Amino acid sequence: MSCSRSDAEHYISAGWVRVDGRVELVAESRVGDSQKVELDAHATLKPAAPVTILLRQPTAHAGDAAADASDGDPAMEYLKSAARASDDRSGIRVLKSHFTHLKSVAPLEKGASGLVVFTQDGRIARKLTQDAGGIEREVIVEVEGEIAEHGLKRLNHGLEWNGKALPPIKASWQNERRLRFALKGERPGQIVHMCASVGLKVLGMKRIRIGRVPMAGLAPGQWRYLPNGGKF
């Protein structure tokens, strides 16, 4: 078949073209006379649907390129070298265009690890930014020290921050060194402040869920797509 240069570039960037059986994503690649070029039978000129990527961000350490990211978001640096989870069941084909125009919409506190979100979808971006106060986030917090009397009850309901009462949350012991927090409208520094208010020092934080979306199945440094129609 014949097509314009712009159409050909679209087919290639969308992953519809194979050279010797392998998907070719670089339009400028040279193809030899003996090589077999195939266009997928389902190829379309429709723009690729926007995607959302879920990354398990490792804990940043001094000296990491991500820890020193100039844009202040280490997750973006981790994503550049991260690997797609082998059990990603979204059915979405990886395209080069999926890694452009991504917006980080659920960054972690400095030094924390766990689930972060990148999206090209404006609806999801608004959900996780403008409407973030209504979405519950679950965080595992490693602590040391002896909790104050009635400390767990106070964590759940009874603390103040900057002179204002904090809304009720769900806090429980996972084991003798780890607390599980489930809270909405989390603000930077809030968990550290809450723990300090009841005599505990935070050693580490790991976010394991945002709304309905869990981190389960992702190893540190791995990512997967949010399935089409997936919701937070």
Language model segments and positions:
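Basic, flexible Lys/Arg- and Gly-enriched helix-loop patches that mediate nucleic-acid binding at interfaces
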Residues: 1-232
